[in-house]
Amino acid sequence: YLGVVKKEWNGFNILQTSAGRTGALDIGFIPSKKGLNAKQIFSKADEGDLSFIWLMGVDNKDVLKLKKPFVVYQGHHGDVGAHIADVILPGAAYTEKSATYVNTEGRPQLAKQATFPPGDAKEDWKIIRAFSDYVKNKLPFDDLESLRNKLYDEFPHLGDIDEIKKARWSKFGTKGKIDNIELKSSIENFYNTCSISRTSETMAICLNNNINKIAAE
């Protein structure tokens, strides 16, 4: 017993390896009963059982394994996902759109557009809304306000901007043996964890300085 969760203090949290994962989990963005998780998707794609994959800003190195399916990439900064895609739908970075985010505490936050997306890039919801028209399955919103109203109707806590909702705890985990292996961070390089930081000259300098510092030690 670690004693990190008490009535007067909650010292337990999870640092997700993807910035959008906390918000995605909040709206139930997980595989359905007959759905596949990420590992299974890559495995099925490699076996030739999946013919089509739509990457929503997915830029981790695992996407390089997608050799067989037809790949649509929606994102920005031309990162790994764009390099292997058959079709690219240029999206907007967080500075180029107004959006709702959820931080690692579970606190909903609003971001306001600071600049316009370059070229033909569009806000992500506009891309998906346009595609829904193309496949004749129109989504029930036409602007950001109606989209947010729909979001807040289904997930009211996301409308409580800058507030943290008390977590509903339940039992989790399973019993099992712990392997005798080294515990280490799942993130090897904190300077290049997303498509924006990987194209940043400043972060490249920080990374090189850190590498040189470690080498000197």
Walk through the language-model features, giving the residues of each.
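Long, low-complexity segments enriched in small/aliphatic residues
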Residues: 148-217
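Non-catalytic alpha/beta scaffold blocks inside enzyme catalytic domains
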Residues: 1-165, 213-217
